[in-house]
């Protein structure tokens, strides 16, 4: 059981470790610069930015370590870049195997197409979980190293609640992967989809009468700034993201089961 999931997870292990180290080091670099901003009027600088930009990246209380981490690490690197990455990786999974004719070999075994999709998704969950286990340790250690303090509970929650968000981005990529047979096209479409959804939420969030449009975006349900700065945990948003993930994975299974591979 779960042979496909184990194989795919092991194949991504080295890349996951490299990504975790890279994000951890980048976070430490950002933190190393924070003390030098002590005398700067960061709040005044932020007020000079357009409201849409402030809304897009959740800029709030940037003069505090919580606000600084929220904007520099979690709003940009974690929410946007990592969301794009997991969607990209998922989109190239099944489409890549189909393009390289590896999927024909997999399906020659006693395994259903639905199981292939589910186990592929399970393997894609491993990097998400690993990153959320490794990176917060580096961030917390970095905060202490520069003489600052941060709520360990809030830091843990910003990572815990990012899991449903990242899984939703993964599911978007997976759904695209079963529709297209060229990995490069699927990956680019997944990146474009997640980025456009990010822009939709960013633009409509501060627009009277149009806020509801942003509810189609995964970023609508995960706000690192609210967690780190205000200690507000959006459990409802996490449930919505998990439900959306389940629907997308189910849809991907159905589409892949009914599709004609290689067409």
Model-identified regions with their sequence ranges:
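Long, hydrophobic alpha-helical segments
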Residues: 69-93
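Aromatic- and glycine-rich beta-strand/loop motifs that create alpha-glucan
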Residues: 1-24
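Hydrophobic/aromatic residues in alpha-helical transmembrane segments
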Residues: 83-90, 138, 171-172, 218, ...
